[in-house]
Amino acid sequence: MDDFSSISLLSLAMLVGCYVSGIIPLAVNFSEEKLKLVTVLGAGLLCGTALAVIVPEGVHALYEEVLEAKHHDMGDIHKAKDAETGAEISAAHEHDHSNLHAYIGVSLVLGFVFMLLVDQIGSSHMHSADDPEAARAASSKITTTLGLVVHAAADGVALGAAASTSQTSVQLIVFVAIMLHKAPAAFGLVSFLMHAGLERNRIRKHLLVFALAAPVLSMLTYLGLSKSSKEALSEVNATGVAMLFSAGTFLYVATVHVLPEVGGMGHSHKPEVGATKGLSRLEVCALVLGCLIPLVLSIGHQH
């Protein structure tokens, strides 16, 4: 199968898988208590996915080429038995590794700061509304969706860059990594929007935009890359950088929007019953379970 057919199939699978997993909370009618529990589980899935799947996958993609090159060079050293050459090569690898460490931090921080700026710009436009609380809630819904769409778009670029390397194994690894977190993310996004009180038709539109972002960007990236730019991309390891940038956006959405929103849900329930602000024990268990599920899935998906 040629690269174009494989990237088309992977994009289609990504679109269908993401949309179907996002529809699940909409298809089932939850009571208010159960919806809260599902929302907390979704928040846990978003956080666990960011930390246990996306960051490690991005780091792995970044280091993969260097480790392979090092492996080949070590073989050459053993053949040559030349101590001086060996020292030079190991020094070059130390330099490579220090560069890669910088890439990791810069990509994560840029993703986080990018979403922070988008959030501030979005909320500054919203503050002119009469009801500041309603404006904040509306801004939160938009930012959450926008953050996940930006994240999905960066995923799409990563998959498109991986497809342009013509290595099926790299494509499949990136695809599996993306699917492992897109399904929980779609579930988390829809349950969060349901809790925020968005109408079902609008939730479906948000979900469709999120589901389309990665497939469309992966196709555009693959088709838009010329041969020379493909070589340049493989040199700077665009797949790893794009995944880490998307991890930064994902972390922002999970920690700054979804978690505080979920943590502050206690006050929306029967205020007279008592000051049960924060989460109940069952909700804490659901949150922890949500964080652990992506971890277990990622352990099962060994390279």
From Swiss-Prot:
Pfam family, one: Zip
Transmembrane segments annotated in the record for this chain: 7-27, 35-55, 102-122, 142-162, 172-192, 206-226, 240-260, 282-302
Annotated compartments: Golgi apparatus, trans-Golgi network membrane; Cell membrane; Cytoplasm, Perinuclear region; Mitochondrion
Coiled-coil segments on the chain, per record: none
Glycosylation: residue positions: N29, N237
GO cellular component: mitochondrial membrane; mitochondrion; nucleus; perinuclear region of cytoplasm; plasma membrane; trans-Golgi network
Recorded topology in the membrane: Multi-pass membrane protein
Gene Ontology biological process terms, A to Z: bicellular tight junction assembly; intracellular zinc ion homeostasis; regulation of cellular response to testosterone stimulus; regulation of vascular endothelial cell proliferation; zinc ion transmembrane transport
Reaction catalysed by this enzyme: Zn(2+)(in) = Zn(2+)(out)
Keyword field: Cell membrane, Cytoplasm, Glycoprotein, Golgi apparatus, Ion transport, Membrane, Mitochondrion, Nucleus, Transmembrane, Transmembrane helix, Transport, Zinc, Zinc transport
Family: Belongs to the ZIP transporter (TC 2.A.5) family.
Task of the protein: Transports zinc ions across cell and organelle membranes into the cytoplasm and regulates intracellular zinc homeostasis. Participates in the zinc ions efflux out of the secretory compartments. Also functions as a membrane androgen receptor that mediates, through a G protein, the non-classical androgen signaling pathway, characterized by the activation of MAPK3/MAPK1 (Erk1/2) and transcription factors CREB1 or ATF1.
Stated name of the protein: Zinc transporter ZIP9
Originating species: Xenopus tropicalis (Western clawed frog)
Gene (UniProt): slc39a9
